């Protein structure tokens, strides 16, 4: 389990000081050194400071857009299947907009991936 900041700041538009304070606020609630930058946007000064603080920065390969009510579930499933590769890191969200997908579609995807021979692993904290 990792975290994603406290208030979801865009690293490109947020000062290093504010960004790091936001990450620290989240880290106080979720004690993990795994961190995924919101929007995948992180400046080099923020990246270096986070690394110095001991964070392991983890990016992703596919965003599910599970929060988008306009995206049809069958299109989401098709997209996830098409973009599956060994080592892929998918982003799913744990917010109210994404609950229908998490409850209904994610189990179907996980069953599909297992049938295809994929396994699920945690990202190590070190």
Question: Model features per residue range: what roles?
Answer:
Residues 6, 16-44, 48-51, 78-93, ...:
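CE4/NodB-like, metal-dependent polysaccharide N-deacetylase domain
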Residues 44, 98-99:
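Short glycine-rich, flexible loops that bind phosphorylated cofactors or substrates
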Residues 13, 17-20, 40, 74, ...:
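Soluble non-cytosolic domains of exported or imported proteins
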Residues 100-126:
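C-terminal domain-boundary segment and adjacent tail
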Residues 8-14, 66-68:
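A short acidic, helix-capping loop that chelates divalent metal ions and anchors anionic groups
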Residues 33, 41, 47-83, 117-126:
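His/Asp/Glu-enriched short active-site or ligand-binding loop at hydrolase and phosphoryl-transfer sites
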Residues 63-65, 95-98:
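Short Gly/Pro-enriched loop/turn and capping motifs at secondary-structure junctions
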């Amino acid at each position: 389990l990792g975290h994603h900041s406290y208030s979801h700041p865009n690293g490109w538009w947020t000062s290093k000081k504010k960004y790091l304070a936001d990450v620290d606020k989240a880290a106080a609630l979720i004690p993990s050194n795994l961190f995924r930058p919101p929007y995948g946007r992180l400046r080099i000064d923020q990246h270096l400071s986070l690394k110095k603080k001991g964070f392991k920065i983890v990016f992703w390969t596919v965003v599910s857009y599970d929060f988008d009510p306009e995206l049809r579930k069958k299109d989401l499933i098709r997209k996830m299947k098409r973009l599956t590769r060994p080592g892929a890191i998918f982003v799913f969200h744990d917010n109210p907009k994404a609950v229908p997908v998490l409850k209904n579609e994610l189990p179907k995807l996980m069953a599909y991936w297992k049938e295809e021979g994929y396994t699920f692993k945690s990202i190590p904290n070190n």
